[in-house]
Amino acid sequence: PAEAIWSRSVDAEPTAVCQVEGGFCFALRSRGVYRMDIEAKEIWRASMPSVIDGKRRGQETAISMSVSGEILRIWFDNGLVVDLSMEDGSELDRRNLRVGERIEAVFHSKNEHLLALSTGGIARTNAEQVLESHPTSGPVMAARYQDGAWEFTGWRIDGRLFEGILEISKRTEIGVGFVGQRVLTNDGTLADFPFTRS
């Protein structure tokens, strides 16, 4: 694009991206993981971690990335979590979070994460194990961590998870994101989030 600061073409679909100190990292489907500096110069590239779960070999997708200290964490839709070194992209650790279904999205806070599951439902994790899970009446589209609670919106629902207690409120439209303290819905409206913070 004419007004871009920089642009690069890629030969596969980007499936996850995250900001890191001095640049960003991204994953390309079936290709690999890349760390770039702020000028889009490659710092390192690593092969996509091999994924074996017996059912969908080769079809898993890296859907999210997060950073914890010097670790780049890759989250896959089948529950696999792979830790890579921020220094050189080498694999440090891997584990499988047992959630029972495909993960649609991962929302991150400093010390924990919220998984949005494909048929509705959420699971809270510390990236090592699932701490709790709850069904929802539809898919969760957006979530954020505020004042010790997870707040989320989605398919005709808003919700709040605080100290193991899940509160749900139904809505007419589909919540697709948060704008400040309000919910953006699929019809372009900004609506109030129904839960007040303590």
Task: Please describe what each predicted stretch is.
Residues 60-146:
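Eukaryotic tandem repeat interaction scaffolds
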Residues 1-7, 34-51, 80-96, 120-138, ...:
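Surface-exposed loop/turn elements that mediate protein-protein interactions on large endomembrane-trafficking
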Residues 1, 22-27, 33-34, 70-75, ...:
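Short beta-strand elements that form the blades of beta-propeller/WD-repeat-like
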Residues 9-21, 52-66, 98-111, 136-149, ...:
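Repeated scaffold domains used in trafficking and secretory/extracellular systems
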Residues 6-85:
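Solenoidal tandem-repeat scaffolds enriched in leucines and small polar residues
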Residues 2-4, 12, 16, 27, ...:
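A sequence-composition feature that detects small, non-aromatic residues
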Residues 29, 38, 42, 46-54, ...:
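Repeat-unit-sized solenoid/scaffold elements
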